[in-house]
């Protein structure tokens, strides 16, 4: 793995990895790879030592690749579902809980009657199950909704 901050992208690169998922899914731009975005975050000053990827990267990186970002402190379940139905993708900054003991970024890309579909760049297990709104909303600290 490419170095990222005090570790490598496989361990602490959830922010750039989530952005790569969103950018590719919405634009099909294959230049926006996790290692490329991690390098952009490092050189652009979006990596905060001891913390990880700055939240501002989630807006600035999207804009650089022609993706529209809207940032929210929270969304109601119906708002989350509406945005997903409209073809948007969502990144959440998660606090301590099911996804991490500290902070972590995940992608919400769909929902079914069983719950929300998540891509967790650090956990295949978390990505393989459905998540209910109450669990997600009790742990997120910030939400970005992305549109092409």
Label for each model-derived stretch:
Residues 111-148:
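Noncatalytic regulatory segments and standalone regulatory/sensor domains
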Residues 21, 28, 43-48, 75-78, ...:
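Solvent-exposed loop/turn segments at secondary-structure junctions
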Residues 15-23, 34, 38, 55-62, ...:
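Extracytoplasmic/secreted envelope proteins and their assembly/folding machinery
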Residues 63, 84-85, 137:
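Alpha-helix boundary recognition
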Residues 68-117:
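Active-site-adjacent substructure of cysteine-protease-like catalytic cores
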Residues 32-34, 39-73:
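Mid-length scaffold segments of soluble, non-membrane domains
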Residues 1-48:
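Active-site-adjacent structural segments surrounding the nucleophilic cysteine of cysteine proteases
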């Amino acid at each position: 793995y490419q170095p990222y901050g005090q570790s490598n992208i496989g361990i602490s690169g959830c922010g750039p990895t989530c952005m790569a998922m969103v950018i590719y899914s919405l634009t099909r731009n294959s230049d926006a790879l996790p290692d490329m975005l991690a390098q952009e975050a490092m050189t652009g000053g979006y990596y905060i030592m001891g913390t990880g990827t700055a939240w501002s990267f989630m807006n600035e990186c999207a804009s650089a690749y022609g993706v529209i970002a809207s940032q929210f402190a929270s969304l109601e379940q119906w708002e989350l579902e509406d945005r997903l139905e409209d073809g948007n993708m969502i990144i959440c900054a998660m606090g301590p809980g099911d996804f991490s003991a500290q902070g972590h970024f995940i992608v919400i890309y769909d929902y079914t009657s069983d719950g929300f579909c998540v891509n967790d760049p650090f956990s295949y297990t978390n990505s393989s199950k459905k998540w209910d709104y109450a669990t997600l909303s009790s742990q997120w600290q910030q939400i970005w909704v992305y549109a092409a």
